Every structure is written in structure tokens, then in C-alpha cells.
Amino acid sequence: MAKPANKLVIVTEKILLKKIAKIIDESGAKGYTVMNTGGKGSRNVRSSGQPNTSDIEANIKFEILTETREMAEEIADRVAVKYFNDYAGIIYICSAEVLYGHTFCGPEGC
């Protein structure tokens, strides 16, 4: 049986990786996935004018599963208030259902 969850997604500049990871850890979230990503937005046009996934200029995408929407919104608010006036980024929340995940669901499973 699936366990309901909230998937918080944060896409921003790679330079913020450690700072955002610290906010997520401090929130009590059980973990996250982070990956390099690229794309184009109002503040994400690289010098070539093309979407970019190079290591130097790459963006990152965090995916965080939370049990409550409140926790997801708390993380989102802290990140946006602290960094998004000076750095490019977008944050969104999706409903999710966890099918398997020892840390999220416990030893008995979901």
C-alpha cells in the first residue's frame, strides 16, 4: 500500500547546494535527492544563450519527500526568503505516493 507524501522540488544554482542541504537537514526531512540539471528561464540564460548542464554553470534540482505539507512549505519559505532575491530558482510541491522506501515508510514498508 502506498504512503501519501509531498514532493518538494527546488531548482536553483549549484553554488547553493550545501546551503540548501543544510536547511533541509535542519527541517527534519528524512533525506533528499539532488542532481545536476540545466534549462532556460528568465534568469537562466548562459553566455552561449543555450540551456547548459556543464559542471561550472549547472543548476541543481533537489527532490525532498515530506510527510506533511507544512514541512515542505517551511523548507520552501526558508530557501526562497534567504536566496531567491539574489539567485535564480523555482520551488514547487507535488502530491506523491511512496511505494517503497525503508527510511520513509519504516521497516514494515508502505
UniProtKB/Swiss-Prot annotation:
SUPFAM superfamilies: GlnB-like. One of its GO terms (biological process) is regulation of nitrogen utilization. Induction: By limited inorganic carbon availability. GO terms for molecular function: enzyme regulator activity. It holds the Pfam family P-II. Coiled coil: none annotated. Its main location: membrane. Transmembrane segments: none annotated. It is found in: Cellular thylakoid membrane; Cell membrane. GO terms for cellular component: plasma membrane-derived thylakoid membrane. Gene3D superfamilies: 3.30.70.120. It comes from the Bacteria. Keywords: Cell membrane, Membrane, Thylakoid. It is a peripheral membrane protein. This is Membrane-associated protein slr1513. It comes from Synechocystis sp. (strain ATCC 27184 / PCC 6803 / Kazusa). The lineage of its organism: Bacteria, Bacillati, Cyanobacteriota, Cyanophyceae, Synechococcales.
